[in-house]
């Protein structure tokens, strides 16, 4: 605990300020509450955009070889998908013409919409990448994995898409795809099968361009990186000789979701172990540009009482709910078809049906007060869903995306292709 607190204080002094309101120089005080395990995240969040801005001088002191951040890969920006643009903006490593993120870059990319910075991208030789990845196998594989690694990791674009999908989709679909590629039936896959799983999941997640909303041609054919990456070393070892069991992969998904949730909670709670309801509203509306945004903020000012707060556990339960938005939307269709408003009890029941869990009355009351556009104590659920999708996709959601049924149908189709290929490679001639 003392070591974590010391590291937090050092990072806070180095980072300077949090983009969304963390005061410069604020110290993180470790507590015995539920945020104790995540205390290092306060300082990492506090570093925020300021860290990226200071990266140039730090890199120069390290004597790293760098190239200008005027990345000519951006070219005609409108031809890149929203996710590709975000990846390019936050990536800080380059090897053999390919760009990569560090674990820190990834966390910042899901916390912040953009970074105002003039930065230099570090060019790495293959030996440099091996050095960067050297500590991954000994890192603690819990809910502080990415924070503990910091810059000691390499994340490819395919892995970036895969990690984003973990944050926005329920686990059930991953299990189906995992079992489809498990030709031995022991819920274990090898490295080459995991690469297929990444491409299958990432390929289907609606890679839309900014202006045309057409599927980007480059994304579905992203090639496998020519070097080891963070996830590959974490799951399969440096030489790729290990196998990955689904239970371990599920723990990784749960830990990743927990880590990002803790980081965002600390970001908007200003490092405290509770979040004011106004802070929760700010988190909800962070990536939202709806025309009713002013009405939502008026509701926050007029309907939410000063001093009321949201706990970390309540925040996590709400984030769990947001990974089941497609199922929740189906439950809401009965109200849309009947032209009926959604009242609190009906909303609560729909959440239970979609997720198997309940949201606290405190959370439900907060959501209803914010999204009651007409003052009739009913939820404007259509726009509420749009706001939540933008929130969970970190501003990268395109409304024309396919439904969850279409998504997993595509996943199943691609998984079958992967199974056929796996059988051919394993037996020379498969039963297909």
Curated annotation (Swiss-Prot):
Annotated ranges, domain EF-hand: 169-204, 224-259, 290-325, 359-394
Subcellular location: Mitochondrion intermembrane space; Mitochondrion inner membrane
Annotated residues for binding of Ca(2+) 1: 182, 184, 186, 188, 190, 193
GO biological process, one term: calcium import into the mitochondrion
A GO term for molecular function: protein heterodimerization activity
Record key words, sorted: Calcium, Disulfide bond, Membrane, Metal-binding, Mitochondrion, Mitochondrion inner membrane, Phosphoprotein, Repeat, Transit peptide
Residue positions where Phosphoserine is found in the record: 202
Transit peptide: 1-22
Tissue expression per record: Predominantly expressed in stomach, intestine, skeletal muscle, kidney, heart, testis, prostate and uterus.
Binding site for Ca(2+) 2: 372, 374, 376, 378, 383
A GO CC term assigned to this protein in UniProt: mitochondrion
Domain of life: Eukaryota
Recorded phenotype for the gene knockout or disruption: Mice display diastolic dysfunction, characterized by left atrial enlargement and delayed sarcomere relaxation and cytosolic calcium reuptake kinetics in cardiomyocytes. A significant proportion of mice die from abdominal aortic rupture.
SUPFAM superfamilies: EF-hand (SSF47473)
Assembly behavior: Heterodimer; disulfide-linked; heterodimerizes with MICU1. Component of the uniplex complex, composed of MCU, EMRE/SMDT1, MICU1 and MICU2 in a 4:4:1:1 stoichiometry.
Family note: Belongs to the MICU1 family. MICU2 subfamily.
Comment text on domains: EF-hand domains 1 and 4 have high affinity for calcium and act as sensors of mitochondrial matrix calcium levels. EF-hand domains 2 and 3 are degenerate.
Function according to Swiss-Prot or TrEMBL: Calcium sensor of the mitochondrial calcium uniporter (MCU) channel, which senses calcium level via its EF-hand domains. MICU1 and MICU2 form a disulfide-linked heterodimer that stimulates and inhibits MCU activity, depending on the concentration of calcium. At low calcium levels, MICU1 occludes the pore of the MCU channel, preventing mitochondrial calcium uptake.
The protein's name in its UniProt record: Calcium uptake protein 2, mitochondrial
Protein source organism: Mus musculus (Mouse)
This protein's encoding gene: Micu2
